[in-house]
Structures are given as structure tokens and as C-alpha cells.
């Protein structure tokens, strides 16, 4: 998975969407299919999830403050959220990839 590097308030942040951040998103109720119904809530959750792997000291409240600071500095948080959603979808596609040529492993299925 790709990583994104941001500088906010003169501090470097390495943001990424990982299995742990996706599990966190699921635990707090995120659903990509429901994004249209709760766009602001899910937008904030997706932004926040990017900090989970490398910045455990960043709680959801601080993550939102960092997003506001990022926006006030003239940058576009929507691009970061778009990156996160692309990474989320790539992870889900890889998880469900049953047609891959690399995945031609034969499984031995036995009756229980």
C-alpha cells in the first residue's frame, strides 16, 4: 500500500491505510456504500483513520484539528481523503481477488 507524507504545523506525518486502520473504520461504523448518507461524518473518519498506523498519539479530535490546520494553510484535505478512499478500495479489491493468476493455489476441501 502507498503512504502519504504531509507536513502540518512543521511536523511530518506519514499517513497510510492499513488493515488496522480499516478495522478501526469498520469498528466505528464506516461503510463505503453508506458514504453518500453520512458524507461529513465518513469524510472525517477516513481522514482520521490515516493517522492510526504511524501516529497513535493523534486521537480523532486532534486529527480533525490537523485537517482544519491543513486546510487553513491552503492545502486541500479532499485530496488526502480521496487518496485514503483509493487505498481502502485497493485493499478491498486485493482482499477479494479470486481471479488473480498468482492465486491459483489448489485447496484441499474435506468433508466435516
Which residue ranges define each predicted feature?
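Short linear motifs in exposed loops
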Residues: 16-17
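Charged interaction scaffolds used for protein-protein
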Residues: 1-12, 22-23, 27-37, 56-112
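Short, hydrophobic/amphipathic alpha-helical patches that form generic packing surfaces
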Residues: 42-53, 82, 86
Amino acid at each position: 500500500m502507498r503512504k502519504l507524507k504531509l507536513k502540518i504545523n512543521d511536523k511530518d506525518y506519514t499517513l497510510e491505510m492499513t488493515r488496522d486502520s480499516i478495522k478501526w473504520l469498520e469498528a466505528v461504523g464506516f461503510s463505503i456504500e453508506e458514504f453518500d448518507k453520512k458524507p461529513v461524518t465518513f469524510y472525517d473518519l477516513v481522514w482520521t483513520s490515516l493517522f492510526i498506523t504511524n501516529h497513535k498519539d493523534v486521537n480523532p479530535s486532534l486529527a480533525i484539528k490537523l485537517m482544519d490546520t491543513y486546510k487553513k494553510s491552503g492545502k486541500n484535505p479532499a485530496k488526502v481523503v480521496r487518496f485514503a478512499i483509493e487505498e481502502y478500495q485497493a485493499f478491498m479489491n486485493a482482499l477479494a481477488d479470486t481471479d488473480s493468476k498468482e492465486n491459483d493455489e489448489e485447496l484441499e476441501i474435506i468433508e466435516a
